[in-house]
């Protein structure tokens, strides 16, 4: 079995690599930071699996296409690369937001599409798109990030229905955690009001749920309730609540 993991140098991606290597998966690990990838590869060598590292910035569209040309015949795709930013929409950095859209949306879209085509040809394979509970609600003061995760949720939901109608054995799932203790928080320049989940526990839970064939993977009771609350409440109310939460983050920096 072979898995391709993007955003593999830290956080959930790194911890999924640890989980899958213990399960005997050969791994292709992709991230921008080659040094961290080398460290992770060295760590995982004890599991006697084949590990290939690819230092690549997936915010660049051509890199995504090149990755697909280079890496073939995978059984499991984990789209995990991504980052966020926090602040008033008119004050956040435009170039950073464009890079975020390329990483969080376009890279996911390209890799999901190209590898799904491959998987459908052999009628097997798994795709896990790492989204966020943010994908189910509006997110003032993190507007671009929330919008990117909403795209991932809706894209994945739509693909799932297409696969169901075709009776395909290819599986797609979405991981939608709340705050997780990862490098994301430093990049997004925020401190969360909610208690942050342990990234290894989130990764282990996600892999376990994928193996069970689950589509929505939402770690934690409080996060599950947040999804339900966002679904049954008016968007205007959810926006007000989210604004207050994000404001606290900015004040805690």
Regions found by a protein language model. Give the residues of each.
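Substrate-binding pocket helix/loop in short-chain dehydrogenase/reductase
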Residues: 88-90, 96-101
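Conserved glycine-rich Rossmann-like NAD(P)H-binding loop of the short-chain dehydrogenase/reductase
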Residues: 23-40
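Conserved glycine-rich cofactor-binding loop
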Residues: 9-10
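C-terminal helical subdomain
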Residues: 174, 191-227
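Conserved NAD(P)H cofactor-binding loop of Rossmann-fold oxidoreductase domains
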Residues: 80-85
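Active-site helix of classical SDR
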Residues: 112, 148
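Residue(s) in the substrate-gating loop at a strand-loop-helix junction
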Residues: 132
């Amino acid at each position: 079995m072979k898995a391709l993991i993007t955003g593999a140098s830290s956080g959930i991606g790194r911890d999924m690599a640890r989980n899958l290597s213990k399960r005997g998966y050969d791994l292709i690990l992709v991230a921008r930071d080659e040094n961290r990838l080398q460290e992770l590869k060295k760590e995982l060598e004890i599991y006697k699996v084949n590990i290939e590292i690819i230092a690549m910035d997936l915010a660049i569209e051509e890199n995504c296409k090149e990755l697909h040309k280079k890496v073939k015949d995978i059984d499991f795709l984990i789209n995990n690369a991504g980052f966020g930013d926090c602040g008033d929409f008119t004050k956040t950095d435009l170039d950073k937001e464009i890079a975020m859209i390329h990483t969080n949306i376009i890279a996911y879209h390209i890799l999901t599409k190209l590898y799904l085509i491959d998987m459908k040809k052999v009628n097997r394979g798994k795709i896990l798109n790492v989204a966020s509970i943010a994908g189910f609600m509006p997110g003032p003061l993190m507007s671009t990030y929330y919008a990117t995760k909403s795209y991932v949720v809706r894209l994945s939901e739509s693909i799932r229905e297409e696969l169901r109608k075709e009776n395909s054995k290819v599986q797609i799932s979405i991981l939608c955690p709340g705050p997780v203790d990862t490098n994301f928080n430093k990049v997004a320049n925020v401190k969360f009001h909610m208690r942050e989940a342990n990234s290894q526990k989130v990764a282990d839970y996600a892999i376990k749920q994928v193996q069970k064939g689950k589509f929505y993977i939402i770690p934690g009771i409080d996060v599950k309730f947040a999804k339900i609350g966002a679904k049954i409440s008016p968007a205007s109310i959810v926006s007000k609540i989210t604004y207050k939460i994000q404001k606290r983050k900015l004040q805690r920096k």
